[in-house]
């Protein structure tokens, strides 16, 4: 019903689709008298109106219908879910395309592939068209990954929808001591609706992961940094210890009086009850 909802809402007359899968959107478009153009990695698509194409292969052009479409719909595979397989299971890889099966990729590689597909589909659309992408949340081996938070957003974000999902793997499992677990069962998917405002501009937002030492962060305060050092160390800590931990770090380079700033911050933390002043120039982290 998701494709039908958006066809009605945006008065779609020509729907394009990446990751056409079992042909549900094709069937909906046929029933609603909407022109359909779809592609899928499957060498033997289940519907005659779905073309075989590897969206990750930039030597292959998208079908002409993408350039006329009012909307493109994407419901990509969910990378790194071990219990679901497409190539070699739901369909046979007769042309050596399994390497592009996003389902078999790790999360980071899979999301890069999905974002590449998103940009390719967006680039083909005429101005004023919409790109709709349905993605999920993944919990695997104790890690929670949000596809939505890692999704590229080209053009203008029109709206976000939250869709109830009634057959998630998370919802079918019984977890030991579920009531005391910090996790809730995953029973939803996310839908991004994106509008292409112009024909020439490619404007997009893509999440980027940063990793750095807090001592080199320009956004961390002296209090943040001193507390991080204290929490990461054991026993009684001297002022000289904090000097050594911070000497040469970016936080100290912009302050010629950084040692005095460290002493001031240590005193403030002791007054706040976060550190204990145990002697002259000696400090200890107070565990809770």
State each model region's role:
Residues 1-288:
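Class I S-adenosyl-L-methionine-dependent methyltransferase catalytic core
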């Amino acid at each position: 019903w998701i494709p039908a909802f958006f066809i009605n809402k945006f008065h779609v007359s020509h729907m394009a689709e990446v990751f056409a899968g079992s042909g549900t959107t094709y069937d909906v478009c046929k029933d609603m008298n909407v022109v359909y153009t779809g592609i899928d990695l499957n060498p033997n698509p289940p519907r005659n109106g779905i073309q075989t194409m590897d969206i990750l292969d930039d030597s292959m052009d998208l079908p002409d219908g993408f350039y006329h479409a009012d909307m493109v719909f994407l419901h990509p595979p969910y990378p790194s879910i071990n219990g679901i397989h497409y190539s070699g299971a739901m369909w046979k890889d007769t042309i050596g395309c399994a390497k592009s099966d996003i389902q078999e990729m790790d999360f980071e590689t899979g999301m890069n592939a999905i974002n590449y597909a998103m940009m390719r589909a967006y680039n083909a659309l005429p101005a004023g068209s919409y790109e709709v992408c349905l993605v999920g949340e993944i919990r695997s081996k104790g890690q929670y990954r949000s596809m939505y938070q890692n999704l590229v957003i080209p053009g203008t974000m029109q709206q976000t929808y939250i869709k109830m999902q009634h057959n998630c793997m998370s919802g079918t499992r019984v977890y030991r001591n579920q009531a005391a677990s910090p996790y809730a069962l995953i029973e939803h998917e996310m839908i991004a609706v994106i509008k292409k405002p112009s024909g020439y501009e490619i404007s997009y937002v893509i999440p980027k992961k940063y990793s750095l030492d807090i001592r080199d962060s320009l956004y961390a305060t002296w209090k943040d940094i001193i507390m991080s050092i204290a929490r990461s160390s054991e026993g009684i800590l001297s002022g000289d210890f904090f000097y050594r931990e911070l000497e040469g770090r970016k936080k100290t380079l912009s302050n010629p009086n950084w040692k005095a700033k460290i002493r001031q911050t240590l005193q403030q933390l002791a007054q706040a009850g976060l550190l204990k002043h145990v002697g002259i120039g000696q400090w200890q982290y107070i565990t809770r």
